[in-house]
Amino acid sequence: KIFLAGVGELMTEVAGEVCDGFICHGFTTEKYLREVTIPALERGRAKAGKTMEGFEIVGPSFVVTGNNEAELERAAVGTRKQIAFYGSTPAYRPVLEMHGWGEVQDQLNALSKQGEWDKMGTLITDEILNTFAVVGLPEQIAPELNHRYGDVIQRISFYAPYSSDPERWSKVMSALQSA
């Protein structure tokens, strides 16, 4: 099978037209997936005379988890920095704009040009974090991923830009497989 990854509408539409599946970038929110990505894939499929049947979507999600408040906070800091890094990229601005956060992209881009990488993460509010990431205790992750994406994706790829206990991920993956 051939898959393409993307964020922008044109690449996404091309993937719908010529591929067997699409890999959503981690910098994709549920709203962006439903309102931009899936319609673009459907347009591409229609151009090729195909439906979405059998087409696979690999869904995105940052995951912020830990067994206590200190672990959750450490995970949140790493994830905020990664979201900020992606958010500084002008090509990804439409994702932020969809949520009314276009001005945050301007600030992130300016800070990136100044080399202020750590400061960038402080611009990612709790609202932004919770929009891009599933945040919670390990037992809350699989149900929330399923709630957000279970009806529109066939596979999930999650991103956790921080170190943590491998056993925690085993539990999350087992819960996802049984969901």
Please give the residue ranges for each predicted region.
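Active-site-adjacent structural elements that line small-molecule/cofactor binding pockets in enzymes
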Residues: 1-179
